[in-house]
Regions:
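Active-site cavity-forming subdomains of large catalytic enzyme subunits
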Residues: 1-111, 115-122, 145-151, 198, ...
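N-proximal short alpha-helices
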Residues: 22, 36, 140, 156, ...
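Short, electropositive, low-hydrophobicity segments enriched in small/polar residues
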Residues: 65, 111, 165, 170, ...
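Ubiquitous "structural anchor" signal
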Residues: 69, 169-171, 183
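Short coil-to-beta-strand
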Residues: 101-107, 131-134, 165
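Contiguous, well-ordered alpha-helical segments that form the cores/surfaces of helical PPI scaffolds
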Residues: 108, 137, 158-173
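Internal maturation/activation junctions in enzymes
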Residues: 128-151, 155, 159, 176-226
Length: 226
């Protein structure tokens, strides 16, 4: 199929929409382009565009690719804005606008330090995750913000990201091959464990400190209220 490329200043709705709404605007602009009512237009086969993108990624390592529809459909903050882009490594997708610059507060658990006598210590993971979440939440309050837009976003949504390091060290200490099914199983189970305790800690902090300004109406509230 053929894709039509537009200049962003002529199609402002495409930046702020996704899914069926985006599709409706896109087809309208395509019709306007066929009528000669758009100033800057380029037609290109989707296969050729994809090949060009993948070739650049292979040759240079950039651009990293993520997809707008899934990012917004799965966004827990879909009620307060649109996800326009991601962080460099595409692990963070937050909504932003002229009034808010998306900011995320990041930390990591070191799996190597969570290994006790060759075993992954789930109790240590639980307590460390809780401590890490509290520290990340505290960072929001004491951090330096270069712009008011960044501060406004951070205080309204209080986003945090908790990842890991030392994964391969843990596999080595458990005598698990990196490319084995057992390694995949450990990755799934360990991250599910971290996710559980991170969400549990977050909900406990909400009782202690109050929910975020934008919790009401979010996916979190919609899930927990049913």
């Amino acid at each position: 199929g053929e894709w039509t490329l537009f200049s962003p200043d002529e199609v402002p709705e495409l930046t702020e929409t996704y899914g069926s709404t985006f599709e409706n605007y896109y087809t309208r602009y395509e019709a306007r382009a066929k009528e000669g009512k758009m100033k800057i237009v380029k037609h290109m086969k989707a296969r050729d565009l994809w090949r060009k993108m993948v070739t650049m990624l292979y040759e240079t390592g950039h651009p990293w690719i993520t997809f707008k529809d899934p990012s917004n459909i799965r966004s827990p903050q879909d009620h307060v804005g649109v996800v326009h882009n991601s962080s460099l490594c595409t692990e963070i997708t937050l909504n932003n606008s002229e009034e808010e610059t998306a900011v995320c507060n990041l930390g990591s658990l070191n799996f190597q330090r969570l290994m006790i006598n060759g075993k992954f210590d789930v109790d240590a993971v639980a307590s460390t995750t809780r401590t890490a979440m509290r520290m990340l939440d505290n960072v929001i309050d004491v951090n330096f913000y270069p712009t008011i837009e960044a501060k406004r976003s951070n205080f309204r949504h209080r986003p945090v990201g908790l990842g890991l390091m030392g994964f391969h060290d843990a596999l080595y200490m458990m005598n698990i091959n990196f490319d084995s099914d057992e390694a995949v199983k450990f990755a799934d189970e360990s991250m599910e464990l971290i996710s559980y305790h991170a969400i549990l800690a977050s909900s406990d902090f909400a009782r202690e400190r109050g929910a975020t300004e934008t919790f009401r109406g979010s996916k979190g509230e919609r899930v927990f209220s049913h």
